[in-house]
């Protein structure tokens, strides 16, 4: 039937921070079964107000950016930079010289302008990277690099989906991409904190909830439809039914502007939820708070199928026969 999956319009489905927060994420992700994020070339540190040269040197050593904290501290003392280090979040490439690291933390603009940046729900990490580039706030690939750094440092099992959509205040200085990535990840951590009991009730991990939220977001922008779609996804998972959400395959193939071919729909691609059982390997975009809420608070019903009609209205069904009738009636 008619393909309605082109982003950002509504879609149909053919079948379907803090240390405490970091600890929660690591515990919840143990059973995900995905390969760990590889250690990135860049690492970040945050220098708090009042930190001494020794404390900063120890941070750098802990981040494996330098081998010897005492040697770097002595370098700062000899160069006269020990008392000139500025607070802030910094992104360093492994293997940088002592002089280059010190210069980053000493020579920063004092007057920094700020602007609001809207990261729309459903945006992929590549979309956000392009948004920063087109806004002149960061270079090509900087945000993708930053999320890899954040994911590694926080023990995330994958990157896509762990960064909450919304409006963010951006300081127009160095490391804008890293600052945004940290802010988006912190926002998601705070958003999920009240729902930890729901994870146990639903018998899913936080990582799985985030994948579900990203799928819901791609399926609809209508908040009232989200709990219904979430209920369908959870029902199908419990019944060991393929999810059949074509947006996952579109994400995996990077195809949003044309109908999927029959060959693609029948492929064994890991993001093809028509063919593979269970959830895709990662999220497929940035969820909104509403989608996250729906993923963790699905509507309790007996539907296993749904479609959107040409006006975007949702038509769920309990059986495949009812689903076929809805297709004939509404599409």
Positions of PLM-derived features:
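Single-pass alpha-helical transmembrane signal-anchor segments
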Residues: 10-23
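Bacterial extracytoplasmic/cell-wall-associated proteins, especially those involved in peptidoglycan
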Residues: 21, 52, 126-138, 152-331
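Signal peptide-directed extracytoplasmic domains
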Residues: 20-194
